[in-house]
């Protein structure tokens, strides 16, 4: 009988396993690479607080024939097990993606799609799977940053990276990536995605917020996004 090999540490098991750490809006942000999904073009496990999102990107080896558009597919998957819950249906199975998952996929798609070459016709699939959920650390933002990171690291042609943050307005103060309690009382729900030089996507809802406050919120978001992009560039 073959004796199983014992490893002294996790890093000895995976030669390419690397961990990168930084802070995002005052909370720890960690990237683990080289351990999962080795057949994808690039893969990373994103940890933001207690939130964990697995991000992967895959490109077909050949362009799709007979199409005049770029076949990009962005999927955000949020299963109930991530929150420690069991589906309430009779079969106890996960259903089709909910409205939140579909909207999150679109929020990630919008800033990333224009940065691919216009003539590109290869199928590209970006998948973000929520493994665990911390209500105070947005899985949408972790997924967006992770999608940007894996695409930038991969051999897929792309003019990124991008970064993204959420902005709230609590008691007149601008808050980056507000917690669950802060989101409940916030007068602003703003999501900003940007490159190092330009804002590429804004999604917002507000309770009569004036233009100056909105502009300040966007500028504050871009300052934080630049830090994220610098972090991604160090990994790339």
Q: Which residues are covered by each model-predicted region?
A:
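Short glycine/serine/threonine-rich phosphate/pyrophosphate-binding segments
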Residues: 39, 138-144, 161
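Mobile "lid/hinge" segments at catalytic clefts and subdomain interfaces of large enzymes
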Residues: 155-236
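A generic local secondary-structure boundary/capping motif
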Residues: 19-20, 32-35, 43-44, 61-63, ...
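Small-residue-enriched alpha-helical segments and adjacent helix-cap loops
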Residues: 87, 91-93, 103, 107, ...
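Catalytic cores of large soluble enzymes that bind and process phosphate-bearing ligands
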Residues: 20-21, 28, 66, 93-104, ...
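Glycine-rich, flexible beta-strand/loop modules in the N-terminal catalytic cores of phosphate-handling
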Residues: 40-124, 130-132, 137, 196, ...
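N-terminal, positively charged regions that mediate nucleic acid binding
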Residues: 2-72
